[in-house]
Amino acid sequence: MKIVRGTKNISGPFPYPVVTLGNFDGVHVGHQILFRKAAEIALEKGGTSMAFTFEPHPLKIIAPEKVPPLLTHFHKKMELIEACNIDRVICADFTRQFADQRPRDFSKNILSDKIGVKEMVVGFDYAFGRGREGTIPYLKKMGEEFGFMVHVVEPFQLDGLT
């Protein structure tokens, strides 16, 4: 698995990029389902499975007083993601400027222009961009505009818990 640090270091084009996005702290079962779904689609299409994540934890920038202790440190998180057959991790520097991006700007500048995403895999409660303005319906709208498909993974239950 290749790890790319910083969005300025993304060097495509990539064969049929299938991307899942999130902080992924803890790399819990729900995250693993997203990674495996992205890897499965990429394998079927002869593409590249990607996880797009952030360093540091977004709350460290947005609301430092609310940042939880990390469940998984960076190197362990990378090991767990790799175990789910992800080909490439893009780790964005989560800065105030990054946090302030509007969802459309992120969709165009990063997802479309830099990565060339073809399919996205997100959880049912996913939101992105400034103030989490980018909802799943909005992401689907961006997919229509920029030419990518969005797969929404429904909640996973284990022992009756979501």
State each model region's role.
Residues M1-T162:
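Nucleotidyltransferase catalytic core that binds NTPs
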